[in-house]
A protein has these predicted regions:
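Short, solvent-exposed loop/turn segments at secondary-structure junctions
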Residues: 14-16, 48-49, 73-77, 104-107, ...
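Conserved SAM/AdoMet-binding glycine-rich loop
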Residues: 10, 213-310
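Canonical Radical SAM [4Fe-4S] cluster-binding loop centered on the CxxxCxxC motif
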Residues: 21-26, 36-37, 174-219
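Catalytic core of nucleotide-activated saccharide and alditol-phosphate transferases
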Residues: 92-184, 193-196
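Hydrophobic beta-strand segments of well-ordered beta-sheets in folded domains
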Residues: 4-9, 41, 65-70, 96-99, ...
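Flexible, charged surface loops at secondary-structure boundaries
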Residues: 1-4, 59-66, 92-93, 175, ...
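A short, structured N-terminal alpha-helical element that caps or precedes a catalytic domain
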Residues: 1-117
Length: 310
């Protein structure tokens, strides 16, 4: 008897809700895991496959999938969910096939409302997923390792090719096409009450750069398809390993950017703040430096840091 061909639907809930300029990193990694296990990208009856659901699929179309992996980064998506998500969660049969996570599902909870438990559950959800644990990872074991899993940077290709004909600007979807994306560190010691890291105490090492750095060459131009790097690190400069990690980024000779910003206060507080500023200023940085200024009481620190930066 032929082995059943499993069909996977990947849902970027934020994309379906209001649109987003960035690909969903969790979905890119899940897609990469299926790719590494021989699944075909794009729906087919002839093989195990996975695809990004990019429109308001009707009820009958949703029946063809065995599992749905739904990621939601923003809480406003849960407040006003897209039709696909509403259908998946409200239908008794379909809801049993749904695995859903992301900061959007819990970020607004207070500690009293169970924020800590929800965050811990969410951070471990995929690595404890029963179905994913039937498939092999690149280390030879079973189950996805979100730290080391190489993303499938082509997951959004079909969506982008369609939408580029709609948007006036060719650059609108460049984040989907031109960047390697990941975290070198995760966490932060600031404990800001509005942040998903509000219970964390430090910045910890996460992925290696090689875990997400894409080296695919464009056959037409002979150049890198993704010549840029962007990083989602929460507070990179708070990591005790900021310097060797920064040196590694610089050594790639690729322009890079910290999309969540850098903690400028550390330029004034850290004993090597001037070295931080000097090294960043001399790096092949992409775009503007983004710095956090979330609390007016930090004004004096910010002023000191700006003087160092200048």
């Amino acid at each position: 008897m032929a082995k059943r061909k499993i069909k996977i639907g990947l849902v970027d809930a934020d994309l379906l809700c209001t649109g987003t300029r960035h690909p969903n990193l969790a979905l890119l990694k899940i897609a990469g895991y299926f790719r590494d296990n021989g699944y075909v990208r794009g729906y087919t009856d002839d093989a195990c496959c996975y695809e990004l659901i990019t429109n308001e699929s009707n009820f009958e179309e949703l029946q063809k999938y065995d599992y749905f992996y739904v990621s939601c980064v923003f809480t406003f998506t849960i407040d006003d969910p897209p039709l696909v998500l509403t259908t998946l969660l409200n239908d008794k049969k379909l809801s049993k096939r749904v695995r859903m996570g992301g900061t959007g599902t819990y970020a607004n909870l207070s500690v009293e409302e169970g924020f800590a438990e929800k965050r811990e559950e969410d951070m471990q959800r995929l690595e404890k997923d029963a179905f994913l644990n039937t498939l092999k990872n690149k280390s030879g074991g079973y189950g996805i390792n979100m730290q080391t899993q190489m993303p499938d940077y082509h997951l959004y290709d079909d969506f982008v090719s369609v939408m580029e004909n709609v948007k006036a600007s060719d650059a609108y979807y460049k984040d989907y096409k031109e960047y390697s994306i990941g975290f070198l560190t995760r966490g932060c010691f600031r404990r800001c009450p509005f942040c998903v890291n509000k219970l964390e105490r430090k910045a910890m090492p996460y992925s290696k750069l090689s875990d997400f750095l894409d080296n695919e060459i464009d056959e037409t131009t002979g150049k890198l398809k993704r010549p840029y790097i962007y990083l989602w690190d929460d507070n990179f400069l708070a990591s005790p390993y900021w310097e060797p990690l920064l040196d590694e980024l610089i050594a790639t000779k690729r322009p890079f950017q910290f999309r969540q910003g850098l903690d400028e206060r550390l330029l004034a507080q850290h004993k090597r703040g001037e070295d931080m500023a000097r090294k960043l200023a001399s790096a092949n940085y992409h775009g503007d430096f983004i710095f956090a200024f979330d609390n007016w009481f930090d004004r004096k620190l910010i002023v000191r840091a700006l003087k160092i930066w200048k």
